[in-house]
């Protein structure tokens, strides 16, 4: 990031967030082709990239774009989007990629200033997805209720333009953003890219993520402000603060008026034990309070989205779960708090009394039904969970078929290694093993018994992870000890995500 900082510094006219002139900068298109501001593989001093990335080409692209739009409008074409609508259009695609880099500059400058003079801790497991579960076990074990909210997405592109207006005051950039959104945009396909009609979300994932995160950040900004100030403000009186233009000036004025005339109607509405987590288009709000208060927060979210962001949302999109009775689906796990407390025996000093401490255990189990549904969509089994063959892989070699099954099985084993109950994971691994055997049997036109007899027991050893294989050799003679150890919860913190079974269209 430091090597690009000199290129991100704006001149006098751009210090007011005038980003439109950056479209004519050569390095913007070089950064767009590199698909990242923090990669070290690109050298801006090297002029090795082709002529498409030059500043003169950028000017020509914009000129040709507007000329074609003018010709389409003047000719009164029945399909005015024929120039913009094609995914393979070079002009609009390159400008949009460059614009995606430009709109990130204000946020990148804030990140650089924030990290200036600070040394980041280097750790291989710093971004591990499993670092979230210790947070759940430490903080959610003493909570009672969880509000599971499905974050709605805006159906009007103009809402995103208004959100972006809070960060950038450049009218030209706002008009260009509005143009791209109205020509390309199909927001219903952003959350589910498989149902995409236009090529916006699939061909421009970087721009999509920026718009979605900026939209979610706005509602979270208001939520955190009102949540922190809820002990001083009435919920019905805080509507004047929702507009972000001159936000802090309105806050100062409102606090002054509130201190003079509304001190007698304070409404205590603050929860010190509340935790908020957002992931994959959903949000979790956990609290120790009563269901009545959680129900108030539920309708608060609905009213905030409908009346301020003009986004349609229904109360049924938010579910209140009791951690003692219900489970929450979080990142591929079914998490819940165990009813029976876990007793931990401790001893402070030698020859002292033994103390039994009752602790509430937070369990994370593998959701068997969603996993079987995923395997069914990928055609590894039928809806009942019975393994079937994979005929689409019949043209591959035997080693390639086995490697693909083993890779999926190992990834699932690593990802769900920390589950408190392994029985569901054993069922999933069994489906993949038998599906692999049936795929090979169908390819060679043989039977399962004959095929397994020819391969031997070494065939199933490939499905074991490296950790399982080592432990099975160590505890091969002590089956009880090995079985008890394998049932324990072991997190493999180098696993970031499952990249095989998430996208079903790969199979």
Swiss-Prot record:
InterPro entries: Domain_X, Maturase_MatK, Maturase_MatK_N. GO terms for biological process: mRNA processing; RNA splicing; tRNA processing. It holds the Pfam family MatK_N. Keywords: Chloroplast, mRNA processing, Plastid, RNA-binding, tRNA processing. Coiled coil: none annotated. GO terms for cellular component: chloroplast. Transmembrane segments: none annotated. Disulfide bonds: none annotated. It is found in: Plastid, Chloroplast. GO terms for molecular function: RNA binding. Usually encoded in the trnK tRNA gene intron. Probably assists in splicing its own and other chloroplast group II introns. Belongs to the intron maturase 2 family. MatK subfamily. This is Maturase K. It comes from Cupaniopsis anacardioides (Carrotwood). The gene is matK.
